[in-house]
């Protein structure tokens, strides 16, 4: 066991450096994770730009909240509680719930009042320091949310657990999509593709995914995962295309997972059916939506729901879907980078690095 662990630390906006931290001793109630694979998503891009401060991120912090690793050390009480042993591959949710506030007690721990999260919300000045997955080791707090990865599932495959879990929660558990429905997914990134899988699992009849010309490969992947239609909005009128596909009835559910762009929010009002249509807003914009026609919501009786993340009710099904081998999820894993190249991984997710990225990972031991 090394005495120190290198880790990728955000020290300021657009400033990242690799630092070393002591590997902590473990008691009866906590554990130590030997990191294998860290998924990088749009939230990491926001943290890199400094936009995470509005939701509680504080510099300096170790990046990495989509974490897969091997239990290296674990206390007796922690092993009993999490039902895992040394050598087990596990997935970790990013929240560290307090377990006492009304949100935790109600099962809504993503909204925990203490707002502690791996990979963003705990500074490196807080012992035992290793609070993010972009490190060779990560500390497992007694309140960490730990899930055993099914046997036979690789670290690379398991790293897709959060995008798929997000899709399950948004499409199935919140929106209630089911057989016979038409679902439009705006944005074919990893979150949108997770929604495709969730919609397919729910038995949705028509799954329509929209994107730009630069998303051609992602749209192909959407088809491979189960989308019935894909639309390049640079070449086709999305509203007209959805009207054609649905015989003018439009979509039962529209999910906007696009990051930064506000136009899809306004367009969603025209894509969704009247009287009972639902819109899920899952893509952060970090700015107001101009000319948002609120009267459309009233007159057409549309429901709009904001969503963020996943929970235990969607994590377990996500891991089981991955283990089933039903979907070619390997198509999502497009780029991997070593720890020293964490910044390049983030830039790739933000569209300023390697091209044609879908799901990007950091491999801390590479």
Residue positions per predicted region:
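C-terminal hydrophobic helical "lid"/dimerization subdomain
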Residues: 1-7, 221, 236-237, 244, ...
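Short Gly/Pro-enriched turn/cap motifs at secondary-structure boundaries
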Residues: 11, 22-23, 58-64, 126-131, ...
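Glycine-rich beta-strand-centered segment in the early N-terminal region that forms part
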Residues: 24-38, 52-105, 144, 150-152
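Cytochrome P450 core scaffold surrounding the K-helix E-X-X-R motif
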Residues: 43-49
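NAD(P)H dinucleotide-binding glycine-rich loop of Rossmann-like/cofactor-binding domains
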Residues: 98-186
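Mid-domain Rossmann-like dinucleotide-binding core that forms the NAD(H)/NADP(H) cofactor-binding site
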Residues: 136, 150-236, 240
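Glycine-rich cofactor phosphate-binding loops and adjacent beta1-alpha1 units
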Residues: 174-179, 208, 217-220, 224-302, ...
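Rossmann-fold dehydrogenase core element
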Residues: 278-280, 292-331
């Amino acid at each position: 066991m090394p005495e120190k662990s290198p880790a990728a630390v955000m020290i300021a906006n657009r400033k990242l450096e690799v630092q070393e931290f002591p590997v902590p001793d473990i008691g009866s109630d906590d554990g130590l994770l030997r990191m294998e694979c860290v998924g990088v998503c749009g939230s990491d891009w926001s943290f890199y730009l400094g936009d995470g401060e509005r939701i509680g991120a504080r510099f300096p912090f170790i990046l990495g909240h989509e974490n897969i690793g091997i239990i290296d050390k674990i206390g007796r009480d922690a092993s009993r509680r999490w039902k895992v042993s040394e050598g087990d591959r596990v997935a970790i949710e990013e929240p560290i719930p307090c377990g006492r506030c009304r949100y935790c007690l109600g099962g809504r721990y993503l909204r925990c009042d203490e707002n502690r999260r791996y990979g963003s919300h705990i500074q490196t000045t807080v012992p035992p320091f290793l609070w993010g997955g972009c490190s060779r080791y990560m500390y497992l707090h007694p309140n960490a949310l730990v899930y055993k990865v099914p046997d036979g599932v690789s670290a690379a495959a398991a790293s897709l657990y959060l995008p798929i879990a997000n899709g399950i929660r948004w499409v199935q558990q919140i929106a209630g999509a089911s057989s016979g429905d038409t679902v439009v997914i705006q944005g074919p990134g990893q979150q949108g593709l997770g929604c495709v899988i969730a919609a397919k699992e729910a038995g949705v009849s028509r799954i329509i995914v929209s994107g730009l010309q630069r998303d051609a490969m992602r749209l192909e992947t959407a088809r491979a995962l189960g989308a019935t239609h894909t639309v390049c909005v640079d070449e086709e009128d999305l509203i007209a295309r959805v009207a054609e596909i649905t015989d003018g009835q439009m979509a039962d559910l529209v999910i906007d997972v696009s990051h930064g762009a506000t136009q899809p929010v306004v367009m969603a009002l025209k894509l969704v059916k009247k009287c009972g249509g639902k819109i899920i807003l899952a893509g952060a914009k970090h700015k107001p939506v101009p000319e948002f026609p609120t009267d459309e919501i009233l007159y057409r009786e549309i429901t709009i729901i904001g969503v963020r993340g996943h929970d235990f009710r969607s994590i377990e099904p996500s891991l089981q879907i991955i283990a089933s081998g039903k979907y070619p999820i390997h198509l999502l894993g497009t780029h991997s980078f070593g720890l020293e190249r964490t910044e390049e991984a983030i830039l790739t997710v933000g569209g300023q690095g390697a091209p044609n990225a879908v799901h990007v990972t950091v491999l801390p031991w590479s």
